[in-house]
Amino acid sequence: MGKTNYSREPANQAKAVKTSASDLRVHFKNTYEVVRAIKGLNLENAKRYLKAVIDRKRCIPFTRFTGCIGRTAQAHEFGRTQGRWPVKSVKVILGLLDNLSANAQAKSLNTANLVIQHGQVNRAQKGRRRTYRAHGRINPYLNSGCHVEIFAQEVAAKVRKEAPKDAAKKVPKTKKGKLAIGN
């Protein structure tokens, strides 16, 4: 198999790791929501989150494909009402995250500082099967597979800005007006 083309490239190739998978036999809509939920998370936090989803301690919030999705209290954590626990999609994405961490170790990057910056799920070609119906008819049985690509980049730890020592305390305009009147 040849080189995989990604839809986006990381800004710093030396500090980034990539992984992808094609023609996965998991539901496109569920996998889309799983990847959307882990985007922007630290690699270790994403793994911990997905393991909690498998244990049904936390849910995947459904934001785009919300038709006939049940409501759960676990989705309130994300400001949503609808959520699910798509175990098969979560296990596939966990495998890709394990691949990311193995790639990071091969590049000798610190996995604790890796942040998932890009995740994309595309529809794959429909898998065609058939089912036999009454009176000699045949109907299609299609499955909606997907392609997934993810990359993570090592991010330096944020340094907090020190507050200036002699900075005057800012007073809001409403407070200034009350002080001027003498109330």
Curated annotation (Swiss-Prot):
Keyword RNA-binding: no
UniProt key word Ribosomal protein: yes
InterPro entries documented for this protein: Ribosomal_uL22, Ribosomal_uL22_euk/arc, Ribosomal_uL22_sf
Alphabetized UniProt keyword annotations: Ribonucleoprotein, Ribosomal protein
GO biological process: cytoplasmic translation
Top-level taxonomic group: Eukaryota
GO cellular component: cytosolic large ribosomal subunit
One term of GO molecular function: structural constituent of ribosome
Family: Belongs to the universal ribosomal protein uL22 family.
Name of the protein in question: Large ribosomal subunit protein uL22
